[in-house]
């Protein structure tokens, strides 16, 4: 339907956890700009203001110095052309755990912040929650998505 209506092929969401070193492109429709780099590492916990994410993707620098307005942009594997995540934040001024200044929390609970670091969230977990009708069921056994509080 997407191809027929808009003349473009839809992107596929990956069903596997990405790996560090994967070449990626963050494609911003808002700014009509592509940012290309690799996955630097996975952050056990990323905190920003009142939000917290697990297993976040951190991008290498230079290359993916994403800016305001790129949140929600797909993170695409250069090799497979699959969407592996969604771009969502970056540390703008070097602050720690505040809005627009996310911080990283490692496995030992140590908190660090890196000015200019940018991050995204993985999508493979969606597949763990799909039922037989391809609908998301958060109560499905093995579902890895967070449930609303």
Regions found by a protein language model. Give the residues of each.
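Short glycine/Trp-rich loop-beta-loop segment that forms part of the substrate-binding cleft
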Residues: 10-39
């Amino acid at each position: 339907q997407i191809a027929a209506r808009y003349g473009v092929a839809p992107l596929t969401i990956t069903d596997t956890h990405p790996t560090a070193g994967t070449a990626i492109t963050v494609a911003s429709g808002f700014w009509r700009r592509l940012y290309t780099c690799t996955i630097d590492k996975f952050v056990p916990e990323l905190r920003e203001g009142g939000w917290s994410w697990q297993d976040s993707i951190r991008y290498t620098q230079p290359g993916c110095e994403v800016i305001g307005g790129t949140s929600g942009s797909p993170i695409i594997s250069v090799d497979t052309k699959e969407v592996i995540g969604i771009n969502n934040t970056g540390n703008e001024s070097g602050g720690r755990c505040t809005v627009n200044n996310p911080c990283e929390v490692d496995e030992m609970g140590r908190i660090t912040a890196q000015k200019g670091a940018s991050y995204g969230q993985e999508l493979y977990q969606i597949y763990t929650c799909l039922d037989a009708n391809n609908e998301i069921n958060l109560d499905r056994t093995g579902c890895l998505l967070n449930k609303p509080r």
